[in-house]
Amino acid sequence: MFGLEDVHSVVRAVEKHHEWLKKCLPMIASENVTSPAVREMLVTDFGHRYAEGKPGERLYEGCEYIDEVELACVRLAKELFGAEHANVQPTSGVVANLAALFALTEPGDTILGLRISHGGHISHHDISAPGVRGLNVEYLPFDEEDMAIDVDGMVRKIEEVEPSVVMLGASLFLFPHPVEEAVEAVEAVGGYVVYDAAHVLGLIAGGQFQDPIREGAHVVTGSTHKTFPGPQGGIVLCQRDLADDIDEAVFPGLVSNHHLHHVAALAVALAEFKEYGERYARDTVRNAKALAEALYAEGLRVLCEHRGFTESHQIAVDVREQGGGAVIAEKLESANILCNKNLLPWDDESKSHDPSGIRLGTQELTRLGMGLSEMEYIAELIADVVLGRREPSEVRKDVEELRREFQEVKYGFGSGVGAHEWPRLADW
């Protein structure tokens, strides 16, 4: 049974991943872990089915219950975010951004976004979604010391280039963005604000960051698996007058079948967030602030001390003096502390493989039930590695010991399956 041998090799790799992750501190800011209830939706028969189009207007038969689930998902999203319209069909955050750009722009238009070194996501740049749409990309002025958009400079830039879209939101996203100011300026030249909430969607839903919809953003996009601990996928929230344009951009424009098991899982995650979201988001930000303060006290160069370090789940650390982001991220991984190397504002964007910084996130540690005392201890462990006080192999033992106490998902529905446990369904 040669095919089964191949299956066994895959299964062994998956098993090793799960066993290893149980012993790690997952601090990559773009990840999270779903609850058992959400995870269960991902293995339903919905993953085998097709349902092109809108509920009630499908191109396939057999969608009665699929429609029921998608309508519930849309309703929950609108309720949770206070949105006039929601589309839950994008298969990723980048697809959600593409949908917004296809709905609001024409090829040859200009948009404004953040440089990658200033925290901007690649899907705001001509190498990604704007390039696919044939757009010209210019950059928002940025205050590197405050890690913030220069509001006066932004307004002048909008008046100068008259963009069709101003893209707010970021991949390195420490503080809220100036939504109201951007809306006022861009509406005067006939444009729109698209707020990419991928990283902070859960913080927004929990009322702990800013509220871009109430601040006037015309469209809010996001991925559903970062601070919002749902399945991997995307979402678009918008004002009612843009609903048809957004929906047509998603289907038939960008998505055919839209991964129905993810819609079911997202519906459960949205329901969870109505119950637990405010507390989870509050604790995530509280943990990030505590971790940043503790890292700074340990002697690390944490950005924006004068602003309280962060208002989100993220922390940025300048590790140039310790060898750079690539070296330090690798050393931390050797200690089972998982983060990512990250460009900082002064970095050459062509050297993203070896930037100055690392980015840390507290959203998954919080989901595991860790709190302020754990943040202080984790800061000590990180500093031990970054500052060379101990060998990563020695720190790894302490990390594994800490993780033994935190193996369950908190702030969610369902129990009986560990956070990073593989719920086996078949015998091999």
Swiss-Prot record:
Binding site for (6S)-5,6,7,8-tetrahydrofolate: G120, H121, I122
A GO cellular component entry from the record: cytoplasm
Gene Ontology biological process terms from the UniProt entry: glycine biosynthetic process from serine; tetrahydrofolate interconversion
Main location: cytoplasm
Domain of life: Archaea
Residues the record lists as N6-(pyridoxal phosphate)lysine modifications: K226
Catalytic reaction list: 5,10-methylenetetrahydromethanopterin + glycine + H2O = 5,6,7,8-tetrahydromethanopterin + L-serine
EC number from the UniProt entry: 2.1.2.-
Example of a GO MF term: pyridoxal phosphate binding
Cofactor(s) recorded in Swiss-Prot or TrEMBL: pyridoxal 5'-phosphate
Residues flagged as site, Plays an important role in substrate specificity: H225
Key words, A-Z: Amino-acid biosynthesis, Cytoplasm, One-carbon metabolism, Pyridoxal phosphate, Transferase
Location in the cell: Cytoplasm
Annotated pathway: Amino-acid biosynthesis; glycine biosynthesis; glycine from L-serine: step 1/1
Described function: Catalyzes the reversible interconversion of serine and glycine with tetrahydromethanopterin (H4MPT) serving as the one-carbon carrier. Also exhibits a pteridine-independent aldolase activity toward beta-hydroxyamino acids, producing glycine and aldehydes, via a retro-aldol mechanism.
Oligomeric form and interacting partners: Homodimer.
Family: Belongs to the SHMT family.
Protein known as: Serine hydroxymethyltransferase
Organism in which the protein naturally occurs: Methanopyrus kandleri (strain AV19 / DSM 6324 / JCM 9639 / NBRC 100938)
